[in-house]
Amino acid sequence: MFRPASRALLRAPAVARGPASRRLISTAPAESKPRSWKNTAVRLGLAAGAIYYYNTSNVFAENPSFSLNNQLKKNSAEEPLPTLDSIKPRIREERESAAPKPNAEQAPAQELPFGEGAVKSPQELEEEAGQEAAFNPETGEINWDCPCLGGMAHGPCGEEFKAAFSCFVYSEEEPKGMDCIEKFKCV
């Protein structure tokens, strides 16, 4: 009634036999009839013609033949771009108009000397920080007396620090300053 397991394992599995009439195109047998030389020549000619048309036609060109962007660029090219010399006077005027003019009563109060431990208001600190930035992108100057540099520019390694910091400021490498690491290691 039951077969022993060893006999069932030794026996080869029966392959399911069903209708194998459907095949995919990729698994279909190759045609037994060889193509003629004329057929091969026509196929190669069509392929060469398609490649030639692709390489010489304007249909597949990178730049479109008509574009609104081209017209906008031509109009903007006629306008001169602002230069640093043309921007400086405008920036100075904005700063002067934005800065409140001190009255006679306020002037003596501002001239009082503050000690190093004196407490300043947040507005005064912001104004001082705006004036004492390490680098001014408008003029391209580096303020070596800026307290944010911690006096490194005037210390024992001052010249090395100036070279390294200048390299960092003017670096165009991404991420910023990657080409200046060795100079900072020397400091």
From Swiss-Prot:
Give the UniProt keywords, A-Z. Answer: Disulfide bond, Membrane, Mitochondrion, Mitochondrion inner membrane, Oxidoreductase, Protein transport, Redox-active center, Signal-anchor, Transit peptide, Translocation, Transmembrane, Transmembrane helix, Transport
Q: Principal place where this protein is found?
A: mitochondrion
Where are the stretches annotated Disordered?
A: 73-115
Q: Topologically, how does it sit relative to the membrane?
A: Single-pass type II membrane protein
Please quote what the entry notes about the protein's domains.
Answer: The CHCH domain contains a conserved twin Cys-X(9)-Cys motif which is required for import and stability of MIA40 in mitochondria.
Listed GO cellular component terms?
A: mitochondrial inner membrane; mitochondrial intermembrane space
Q: Which PANTHER family match?
A: COILED-COIL-HELIX-COILED-COIL-HELIX DOMAIN CONTAINING 4 (PTHR21622:SF0)
In terms of InterPro entries, this protein maps to: CHCHD4
Q: Which cofactor does it need?
A: Cu(2+); Zn(2+)
Q: What is this protein called?
A: Mitochondrial intermembrane space import and assembly protein 40
Family matches, as PROSITE patterns: CHCH
Where the record annotates domain CHCH, the positions are 154-187
Quote the subcellular location field of this record. Mitochondrion inner membrane
- Could you tell me which residue ranges are on the Mitochondrial intermembrane side of the membrane? 62-187
According to the record, the segments passing through the membrane are 44-61
Instruction: Return the cofactor note field.
Output: Cu(2+) or Zn(2+).
Q: What does this protein do?
A: Required for the import and folding of small cysteine-containing proteins (small Tim) in the mitochondrial intermembrane space (IMS). Forms a redox cycle with ERV1 that involves a disulfide relay system. Precursor proteins to be imported into the IMS are translocated in their reduced form into the mitochondria. The oxidized form of MIA40 forms a transient intermolecular disulfide bridge with the reduced precursor protein, resulting in oxidation of the precursor protein that now contains an intramolecular disulfide bond and is able to undergo folding in the IMS.
Please note every region of biased composition (Basic and acidic residues): 87-98
